[in-house]
Amino acid sequence: MQANYKISDFLEDFLIAKEVEEGCRPSTIRAYRYDLEKFIKIVGDIEIDHNLMRQKVRLFLKVLKDKGYTKKSISRKIACLRSYFKFLNLNEFISQNPMNKIRSPKIRLEESLPKFLDLKDVQKILTSLQDRTKFRSKKSQRYYLMVRLLYSTMARVSELCNIRIRDVNFEKGYIRLRGKGNKERIVPVDNKTLLLIQKHIDNRIKYNEDEYLLVNTRNEQLTPRVIQNDIQIIKKKCGFSDSKIITPHVFRHTGATHLRRSGMDISELQDILGHSSPNTTRIYAKNDITKLKQSYNMMHPLNSNDL
């Protein structure tokens, strides 16, 4: 007689398999856990071989849609459930995979393009961060440095957290980042941000070069969650609407889009962003519809007076 296993019974086994067998990063594991726990919270911790599991999945997706989740976010959760039920099926915990007939929503090109800030938005944030009537806390200097680093280096939030003092080369003007798969890359930094980093370090009572650059008042490394929360505080105090999407990753997209608009070659941008494939970087070329339109107007024969 088969045991009546619940959805949650194999969650830990699934996450261990993802980490050990597939080498998923801690952030990916956390995302899987979050999505599966969200699923259980909405549909209940029902039996994994429930004959209405496919209907439960569709109910879950409808709840997400009604709550305003984006198609991209819903697609991620579908991918998570698909992976989990495939794991259960391969290990013969379930006889059929309920995700077989569940399709991901179609995402239009404009929905899949990276979100980025206009230059005036970046200027507004940097100017506001230096306004002591808006930002008066001891964290204000950290906020300012954090935003400049995100925009200047286009680092992922985890990469930003992992910068150590020794990774900053003041003489040559670059920072060493550790990206996905612990791959290292060197990214240039503007002079003003370098001076700000030096001032930030000098303000510490004592330090050594192995310490992290961004730390809290207890000299502990900042976590991605802390930086994400800081950015939301900055967004609110700068007066942006709730609908405006501003996250650490948006600054990465913003820096990349602005560099591309200024004429940076895709291969150079790929090196800065740490993309293993140039196809990932090419999406920033699609973002620049303004430049594309200008080139079109200049070069297409139909825009000449002769036709």
What spans do the regions from the language model cover?
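Conserved catalytic core of the tyrosine transesterase superfamily
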Residues: 1-307
